[in-house]
A protein has these predicted regions:
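C-terminal helical cap/extension that packs against the catalytic core
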Residues: 204-223, 236-238, 305-306, 314, ...
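Short, high-confidence coil segments that cap the C-terminus of an alpha-helix
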Residues: 136-138, 330, 405-407
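ATP-dependent carboxylate-amine ligase catalytic core
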Residues: 30-31, 35-38, 64-159, 205-206
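Acidic, Mg2+-coordinating active-site environments of NTP-dependent enzymes
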Residues: 110-111, 135-143, 160-248, 262, ...
Length: 432
């Protein structure tokens, strides 16, 4: 029997990219393991931004409504095991190790037949099916890793898919999904199928037209959330209140994008009710009040105020800028910024950098896609001369706190990958 470290290494050391584009390897492994996915009911989420927030709202409400709910998500903030949850509790190390041993046996049978083994994400996806079947989940809410059509999560049989949800779509991962909004939308829409209702977040006009055409040509049922119908009552860093569809909502998630995510989740749950889910609208309102989702315009420190946000592409950067202007107009802003090299960091810098008084750049830890802080700083200098590369996250936090003083606001963004470490450092500093 492996230990936890060995089980993690077994998954992480598999080849990261399959051979031919497609889902053959994961389908063969599922066949080897008696198709655990066929015993489950899924709510499948694709999109560029907002997947995690919508997932969190839907799963929290379903749990509040008395259902046993599996969550499968990535990336994680605090623990690798965070990606496999039942009613908000992470998978245990013991269950993880035991199920990796099951995966390993299936992979070895594949390899003995000369069949290429699945990638790490495909293995994790199969593990989530095994775990949630064991846990007898009523619903599994899961988000795509990349795109939709060819994503490992799209092995779910359409008859097991109770709802498809499309969150905000914008340009990202263009080397894999296509270089236009139309191409990316069609990739994301690949999770929709016959008999599967779909709910979309409010979308850009080009995305909306592509979706309308795609769904009409295939005869798919869908509905879009309407952000213009949402009336914001109040917004602070602790909570936001708004009216929508005759209901008054309070959510704990700050930031202008979170109203959009909340109404998308609401419409998704209403669609499930329409198709037989036993849930009251009052339970949606109460459940959404309980939803927590860190790393999305989240305050992690009070003195000085420190906000963390996962914004890592131009669309998310525009929403981040909107939140900055709403919450911190006229305040001194200090940034800590780290990006991956395969992101459009130049456009993100153009959108965000002019608002800052000082910027400290960092590298995402333990990731070969991390953009060196010096290179990011060189790019940012086109839009703001006051930028300093830092060797470590701790160095950046200390420098940013000194620059912020008593009245400045520190804003950290660019990737979810370093938020866990940064949050821990900020908590240490706050209690020191």
């Amino acid at each position: 029997m492996m230990n936890y470290k060995e089980a993690r290494e077994y998954i992480e050391q598999r080849p990261r990219y399959g051979g031919e584009l497609g889902l053959d390897a994961i389908r063969i492994l599922l066949e080897e393991l008696d198709h655990p996915e066929r015993s489950l009911s899924f709510i499948h989420i694709a999109g560029t931004n907002g997947k995690g927030s919508v997932l969190s709202h839907i799963s929290t409400v379903l749990t509040y409504g008395g259902y046993r709910v599996g969550r499968y998500l990535s990336p994680t903030l605090y623990s690798y095991r965070e990606r496999f949850q039942v009613n908000g509790s992470y998978i245990s190390r013991e269950d993880f190790v035991r199920l990796v041993c099951v995966l390993k046996e299936g992979v070895e049978r594949m390899e003995a037949k000369g069949i290429q083994a699945p990638t790490p994400f495909e293995l994790e996806t199969v593990l989530c099916f095994l775990y949630f079947r064991e846990q007898q989940c009523d619903y599994v809410v899961l988000e795509c890793g990349l795109g939709g059509l060819h994503d490992a999560t799209n092995v779910i049989p359409m008859e097991n898919k109770k709802l498809a949800v499309l969150t905000s779509v914008s340009l990202d991962h263009t080397e894999y999904l296509g270089d236009t909004l139309e191409k990316i939308t069609l990739q994301k829409a690949g999770i929709i199928g016959p008999g599967v209702p779909m709910v979309s977040a409010p979308q850009k006009e080009e995305v909306k037209k592509t979706l309308e055409s795609y769904c009409k040509s295939h005869g798919f049922q869908w509905k879009a959330a309407d952000l213009s119908e949402a009336e914001v009552i109040s917004a602070t860093l602790e909570k936001q209140c708004f009216r929508y569809d005759g209901q008054e909502f309070t959510i704990q998630l700050a930031g202008t994008a979170q109203i959009e995510n909340a109404v998308t989740a609401y419409e998704a749950l209403q669609m499930l009710i329409k198709h037989g889910l036993d849930l009251e609208t009052s339970q949606i309102v109460e459940g959404m009040k309980k939803t927590q989702w860190n790393g999305r315009f989240t305050k992690i420190s009070e003195h000085p105020i420190m906000i963390v946000d996962g914004a890592h592409n131009p669309d998310a950067a525009m929403k981040l800028r909107s939140s900055i202007e709403q919450y911190f107009a006229g305040r001194r802003l200090i940034y800590i910024n780290g990006m991956f090299s395969d992101k459009d960091y130049e456009t993100v810098a153009r959108i965000t950098a002019p608002l800052a008084e000082q910027i400290f750049t960092i590298a995402a830890p333990d990731n070969d896609r991390a953009l060196p802080p010096e290179r990011l700083a060189d790019t940012i200098r086109q839009y703001n001369a006051h930028v300093t590369p830092c060797a470590t996250i701790r160095e950046a936090v200390c420098a940013a706190k000194q620059a912020a003083g008593d009245d400045g606001v520190i804003l950290t963004f660019g990737s979810l990958s370093f938020i866990g470490e940064l949050t821990a450092i900020a908590a240490e500093e706050e209690s020191a």
